[in-house]
Amino acid sequence: VDDRKGYCMDGVYSEPRQIGWDNYVSDLLALMPHYRLMKESLAIGISGNWGSGKTSFLKSMQKQMNADYRVVTFNPWTCTDKEQIISQFFALMREQTENNEESLHEAIQKYQDIVLDADIHPAITFLAKILPLSKKEETLDSLKDKIEEAITIDGSKPFAIFIDDLDRLEGNELFEVLRLIRITANFRNVVFVVAYDRDYICNVLNESKNIKRAEEYIQKIFHLEVSLPKFEDDTLLDVFMDETVRIASLNERQAARLQQLVMQLFNVDGLSFTDFVPNFRQARRFANVFALNLKSILAHTKDFVVKDFIGVELLHFAYPEIHRTLMYKPMILLKLNKGGLSKSGLLVYEGKDNTPSDKLLRKLFYSNNETQLTSREVRSQLSYANYFCYRLPNNSIGVTEFEMLMIADDLDVVRDGVNVWMRRKDSFDSLYEHFRSYYMHGYKDIKVIRNYICALLEFIPQLSDKGIEQIISDRYWIRGGVDVDELRKQLISLFEYSISKGKFLEKINHLLASFYNAYPDDYE
């Protein structure tokens, strides 16, 4: 079974990412000479916020320590109570003893039994340290000496106890693990490396154990506390890209194009990927949902722009309330800006704030620079819903569908296509909006103009006079570079064909009356 396929978990699937921490880890390990560890126990705290890379840092340490240490990975958050924490910890220590270390194995087991018995009967804790429970039994201190003697003989590798996600624990369990580090398992030649969120630990100790000076308490536990070094912002983008490429099975060309589009969102206005995805865990979580949604929309429609989709999904992930508003009540945030060469209704964001979400909204919903691509952008009413449904909504006619009809060579194909759409239930509004807002390839292609008028003449029976005016008004058909005589010839032929049918003559006449306009003198 290939665990690299499918969704991404917090664990690192391959070698730990090169993020500039290896040298730092080497310097840290240099502070731990073995001759010093033979004399004392050492506890190192790795402090960082949720998702900041603590697990990756621990893995980097483990990789460098595997050869020279007896590495133990202890997950206390899998235990249900403090007795299980103690039992599981010492069981892991015993597993790291050699087969010929039977006396050490036995001493660890006895030590564990006394510790557990002392926890059940607290009154005997002190006596257990100095007095045997029977003539044949050893004291806690004597067993500790025996264990330390066995694990510090010449050539013995130190124990390296790795504890990740200490901040998963609640009050009693957390306190028990800290006591384990500081007192119960405070053996010479043992190194504890513990990852945690300091703020969380302090709050839990304060609330559950009434430890008011929790920071000082933590300082007594850990001899050295490391705050993770800063890494380059691009590192998180690389994590996101690697996981997205893996989950979505993108090829090299697709991956390069996706990264280029992501970077286009963040090359101006001071926007950064880390404004939306601030840490490693979030980068992987975003990759999971983005890859899923990207595969879904790619499978169902071509009527979207990938760069816009990335922006909408970033809002979805980092600002879910804003995304919810865009999905269900868009006009709270946006306004409809009618006009422009395409006559399309563009959704525009006019907020002036400089938060990351405001900057991204302005990049997605702007009012200028209309192109042939505009009808597929999120700011276009024609395609807006696609970005939230991950498909073409029911009864909608896709931009690509309409475009293919506008560039068809055969007029019968155009007429048949429009009539198929007209027979679709509840498709009138979608078809009307396509006619009203179509960009017309800049009015420079005679075939596109011909097909548009041909299709409109088929659709005209369903239109009111006002609808005809809204579609045709402010369209300027004649421009430089167009063969006017050829255009006139083809359009006259289309009108003659429709008139010959003898139906809807008044509407055709209304269309003709609105049709011929030259560019106004001040048009640029």
PLM segments and residue spans:
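A short helix-turn-beta junction within AAA+ P-loop NTPase domains corresponding to the substrate/partner-engaging
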Residues: 208-229
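Conserved ATPase-coupling elements of RecA-like P-loop NTPase cores
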Residues: 169-177, 205
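Structural recognition of the conserved hydrophobic beta-strand(s) that form the central parallel beta-sheet
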Residues: 160-162, 191-196
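A short beta-strand-to-loop transition that corresponds to the Sensor-1 phosphate-sensing loop
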Residues: 195-199, 204-208
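Short glycine-rich substrate-engagement loop in P-loop NTPases that contacts/grips substrate
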Residues: 82-86, 127-148
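Conserved P-loop NTPase "ATPase switch" module shared by AAA+ and STAND
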Residues: 154-171
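P-loop (Walker A) phosphate-binding loop of NTP-binding proteins
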Residues: 49
